[in-house]
Regions:
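Phosphate-group recognition and catalysis centered on beta-loop-alpha active-site segments
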Residues: 1-175
Length: 175
């Protein structure tokens, strides 16, 4: 492995956490749009899998804190998750904001000249599956992009699976 110097680092120094910090509902397209309106070019988002293996944006293993749904994210197919309101918990201005897939976010990021730190946030027991699925989705979405997304995780197992699935994508272990 070669050393990366600051001059080699392709990412901005400032990253908008979960899209726009507390200014919009976290991990939504509204958050990314809000962050971009303040001039941010890079966003950190959390990615996990639905019950049917779709990579989506969500921090928590359960739905209650940031949606009008109940239960575990990985117990629901994405079609059911897509119907949930992920904006009203923040404010009425964001009512009806949905849970986006990683693919949809990738298209927005690339169309808006932005960059992404994808934190792989696996539901316990799905570390390898989540790491591999997120990496493969990222590889496909960014195949022609100049700057790939940064894959990060607190899970060494998820990052190992991401490395095996898409070794060309940069990774970072969070501590």
């Amino acid at each position: 492995m070669s050393d990366v110097t600051f001059s080699d680092w392709p990412y901005p120094a400032f990253v908008a956490h979960r899209g726009a910090g507390s200014l919009a509902p976290e991990n939504t397209l509204a958050a990314l749009r809000t962050g971009r309106s303040f001039g941010y070019r890079m966003f950190e988002i959390d990615a996990k899998l639905s019950g049917d293996g779709v990579a989506l944006l969500m921090h928590d293993a359960t739905l209650e804190r940031t949606t009008d749904g109940r239960g575990r994210v990985d117990a629901q197919p994405f079609a059911a998750l897509a119907r949930l309101d992920a904006g009203s918990w923040h404010s009425a201005a964001f009512a009806g904001e949905g849970i986006p897939t990683l693919g949809r976010v990738a298209r927005w990021v690339l169309a808006n000249d932005a960059m992404l730190n994808i934190e792989i946030k696996p539901t316990p027991g799905r570390e390898r599956e989540t790491g591999a699925a997120v990496a493969l989705d990222a590889r496909a979405a960014w195949r022609d992009a100049g700057v790939p997304p940064l894959l990060s995780s607190f899970s060494p197992m998820a990052l190992a699976a991401a490395r095996e699935a898409a070794p060309e994508l940069p990774r970072a272990l969070l501590l």
